[in-house]
Amino acid sequence: MISASDMLAGLTGLGVTTVAGVPCSYLTPLINRVISDRATRYLTVTQEGEAAAVAAGSWLGGGLGCAITQNSGLGNMTNPLTSLLHPARIPAVVISTWRGRPGEKDEPQHHLMGRVTGDLFGLCDMEWSLLPDTPDALRGEFDVCREALARRELPYGFLLPQGVIADEPLDEEAPRSRAGRLVRHARTGPSDAAPTRVAALERLLAELPPAAAVVSTTGKTSRELYTLDDRDQHFYMVGAMGSAATVGLGVALHTPRPVVVVDGDGSALMRLGSLATVAAHAPGNLVHLILDNGVHDSTGGQRTLSSAVDLPAVAAACGYRAVHACGSLDDLTTALAGALATDGPTLIHLPIRPGSLAALGRPKVQPHEVARRFREFATEPWPASAVGSGTRAAAGSAGDR
């Protein structure tokens, strides 16, 4: 049997800065150890796909992320693993438990996944290994992982059987519940007077400081942003719909720069729990902008459910420090100025019209190139005082959980 300290030492030896995931009883000792360790950040998330997205953002911000899950949650991880981390060639460590291991007694819901877990790692183009139960063998497996991360620049998986890690006590305080401040700006006209997405993106680009990092959601938002002005500080999500907010969370926790997530209503609704995750971990330098056109523009304009959901009120209830419900581009300017000058996270909601630029092209730069130039930008030395004095990041403060 190995200790949780052995596991954590192996992870930090790889360079892991953040561990994010959904618990499993097999993982309890490791989770307890990471929570108690002041040098490593543990993020509770609402869904396993968020853990993979946080791991991606951690690397983009200059660290290395570890996503942990029960193997029943690997299905939720598959989308970001295959459509974000793989095409962008983002290294990460993925630790999955092995419930339903063939030959071991377990609950019926684990039997099928237990048979296919290793195959699923392989189908996601991940090299992986079984976590051993002796410290010497464990060090050897971490050496294998280190070499694979450097060679392939892709996620590497560990499969954790039952009873490998010894018990570890827990030292944790529950997050405090807090409601954010919601500002509803006056609407200036009918819905058909709402700005276009291009106009909103143009206003955003005009107002953002040069030091800001931008994570844009998949689909036409990223394509229009690329068309308007392709910059090193832009990370275009080409897949993993619904993950922009948690990618931005991972970035914001690793850099003092302001980080702006440009999201859509369909994407935000797809992983609505991410609002709770972002608010709970409260990076002060994160601005989350939702451009709400009420439709899935990239797939033909089918309606989303945003007309039935008060997204600003949801964000405030989840604990975003400030929420702005905007009605115009001028409201957006005001909200951005306030968000960049004060502690966040801040959510800005702006209704926009459906539709996009005619003959809209696609980024010609490859996802792995976008990821590397973004990481280089995010890790360049930069004084936090360059933006409003209230803006702060959790970078380097793993103890502030």
Curated annotation (Swiss-Prot):
Residues 384-401 have a biased composition (Low complexity). Its EC number is 4.1.1.82. Gene3D superfamilies: 3.40.50.970. Residues 382-401 are annotated as: Disordered. One of its GO terms (molecular function) is magnesium ion binding. It is an enzyme of class 4 (lyase). Belongs to the TPP enzyme family. Involved in the biosynthesis of phosphinothricin tripeptide (PTT), also known as bialaphos (BA), a natural-product antibiotic and potent herbicide. Catalyzes the decarboxylation of phosphonopyruvate (PnPy) to generate phosphonoacetaldehyde (PnAA). This is Phosphonopyruvate decarboxylase.
